[in-house]
Design a protein with these regions (language model features):
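PLD/PLD-like phosphodiesterase catalytic module centered on the HKD motif
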Residues: 1-118
């Protein structure tokens, strides 16, 4: 089994956005678990997500209401995609949800990005 670890340092050449786009374009399915989704961030991925929808590449996204950072406008936009299964975890004061994981299913392997770009 080939092991290929990589540190994403958010330079001009290698940053989280570019890695997400690259892996989305290469995958057969994708799974995101992210604490927050805002519309401005989602806009950066819209063209790629539309391309995936046209190719019938399925994805699942789970996010949360944790700290009220997720924007309803972003969720509404994601719901327009027929290939994306969107789930929203309703957080409360006792139970938070602050994950940042991106999983890309390929024919022979999975690629996983864990962490934040901030």
């Amino acid at each position: 089994m080939e092991e290929n670890n990589k540190l994403i340092i958010n330079s001009k050449q290698s940053n989280l956005l570019n890695e997400l786009k690259k892996n989305l374009k290469e995958c057969e399915r994708f799974y995101f678990s992210v604490a927050f989704i805002n519309f401005s961030g989602l806009q950066l991925l819209l063209d790629t997500l539309k391309e995936l929808e046209s190719r019938d590449i399925k994805g699942k996204i789970i996010t949360t209401t944790y700290l009220n950072f997720t924007e309803p406008k972003a969720l509404e936009k994601l719901q327009e995609f027929e290939n994306i299964d969107l789930k929203v975890f309703i957080a409360n004061k006792e139970i938070g949800f602050h994950t940042k994981a991106y999983i890309f299913e390929n024919k022979d392997n999975y690629k996983i990005i864990i962490g934040s770009s901030n």
